[in-house]
């Protein structure tokens, strides 16, 4: 009995160790940094802290969230500090590969804290520490110029091309014509997989949501659902592509719903329509009132205001103007200031008799 119980205990311990080995392996990889903790990322910290803030306030640039050192001061340090120029620390013997690495390392031996938070009194020696502090404490995601994420309304035109005046080589970054944008905030990326993960983890929803409550992770499932019990009008797409104006794929001048994410400029549309239509000249058409003709007080006020409101409008229909003039001709109160409408020739009795003889 003792041997059997011992074997049973060994089997149970072996089984437990076998079952717990994947979890131990996962913990080991997380400690070594091989596996990222999704609840400890910057996006997760922002989503956990900034529940009451609007989404457009969560993504800011480095200059808007962090106050950094002056660039001229940093350049003087690189020129005057021998440790930076030789890439070797004279205090501890640390050797670095880059100038920026040596500048960051020199702050370890000094009390310099050049980075300051713009929302509190927190200071730090390194920028990465302040970026994490702003995300964890204030719920703001700092988007740097080297990060993969991009703010939709941020204009970083200076980072589009890097041209050197001393050399003939000019490296121009080619922009992709299609990006993907989150409709719930201002996050944008060129990969749809990043946007799908962003919507799922940050906003706790799916890329495609139906008004009936159904959620879909891809467009194919949403289209199949819209062809069945629900219509395509009921679908809300939280991830939509955005196009540049020069792109042939850009659906410019196309009408879309508020959930599509593709917006057009109404002023540009109106200018295109008005430029394509002929503009009528005042006084050139007999259906329009000439501005030089006097208007007598016997003219009806409501008709007068209607004509004055229609006259300078370039999009007025001539058919409406003809109907309005015909109503004036049939009206008993006709002004005497329109010679083209009221005949001014008065026939004598003899002429009237001649006309009667001709008609007879």
From Swiss-Prot:
Query: Is this entry keyworded Glycosyltransferase?
Result: no
Please list where the region (Disordered) is annotated.
Answer: 19-41, 248-272
Q: Which domain of life is it from?
A: Eukaryota
Instruction: Keywords in alphabetical order, please.
Output: Metal-binding, Repeat, Transcription, Transcription regulation, Zinc, Zinc-finger
Task: Name the GO terms of the biological process aspect.
Answer: negative regulation of transcription by RNA polymerase II; nematode pharynx morphogenesis
Please name the PROSITE patterns in this protein's record: ZINC_FINGER_C2H2_2
Q: List the disulfide bonds.
A: none
Select a single GO molecular function from the record's annotations and give it. RNA polymerase II cis-regulatory region sequence-specific DNA binding
User: Key word Zinc-finger present in the record?
Assistant: yes
Expressed, tissue-wise, as follows: Expressed in pharyngeal epithelium/arcade, which connects the pharynx to the mouth.
InterPro entries noted in UniProt: Znf_C2H2_sf, Znf_C2H2_type
Q: Where is the composition biased (Low complexity)?
A: 248-260
Q: What does this protein do?
A: Transcription factor. Represses gene expression, probably via binding to DNA consensus sequence 5'-[AT][CT]TTCC[AC][AG]-3' in promoter regions. May play a role in pharynx morphogenesis.
Q: What is this protein called?
A: Zinc finger protein ztf-2
> Could you tell me the gene encoding this protein?
ztf-2
């Amino acid at each position: 009995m003792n041997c059997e119980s011992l074997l049973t205990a060994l089997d149970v311990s072996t089984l437990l160790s076998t079952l717990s080995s994947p979890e131990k392996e996962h913990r080991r990889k997380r400690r070594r940094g091989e596996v990222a903790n999704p609840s400890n990322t910057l996006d997760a910290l922002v989503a956990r802290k900034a529940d009451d803030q609007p989404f457009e306030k969560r993504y800011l640039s480095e200059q808007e969230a962090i106050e950094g050192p002056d660039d001229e001061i940093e350049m003087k340090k690189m020129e005057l500090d021998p440790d930076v120029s030789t890439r070797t620390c004279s205090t501890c013997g640390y050797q670095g590969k880059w100038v920026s690495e040596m500048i960051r390392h020199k702050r370890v031996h000094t009390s310099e804290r050049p980075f300051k938070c713009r929302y509190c009194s927190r200071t730090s020696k390194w920028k990465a520490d302040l970026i994490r502090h702003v995300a964890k404490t204030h719920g703001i995601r700092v988007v740097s110029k080297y990060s993969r994420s991009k703010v939709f309304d941020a204009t970083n035109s200076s980072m589009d091309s890097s041209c050197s005046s001393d050399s003939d080589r000019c490296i121009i970054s080619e922009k992709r014509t299609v990006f993907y944008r989150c409709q719930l905030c201002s996050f944008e990326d060129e990969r749809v997989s990043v946007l799908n993960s962003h919507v799922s983890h940050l906003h706790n929803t799916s890329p495609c949501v139906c008004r009936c409550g159904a959620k879909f992770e891809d467009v194919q499932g949403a289209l199949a659902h819209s062809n069945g019990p629900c219509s395509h009008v009921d679908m809300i797409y939280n991830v939509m592509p955005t196009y540049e104006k020069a792109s042939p794929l850009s659906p410019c001048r196309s009408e879309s719903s508020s959930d599509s994410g593709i917006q057009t400029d109404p002023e540009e549309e109106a200018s295109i329509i008005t430029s394509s239509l002929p503009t009528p000249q005042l006084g050139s058409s007999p259906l329009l009132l000439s501005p030089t003709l006097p208007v007598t007080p016997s003219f009806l006020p409501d008709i007068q205001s209607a004509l004055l409101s229609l006259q300078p409008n370039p999009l007025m229909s001539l058919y409406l103007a003809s109907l309005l003039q015909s109503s004036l001709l049939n009206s008993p109160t006709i002004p005497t200031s329109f010679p083209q409408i009221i005949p001014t020739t008065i026939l004598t009795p003899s002429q009237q008799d001649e006309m009667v003889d001709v008609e007879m």
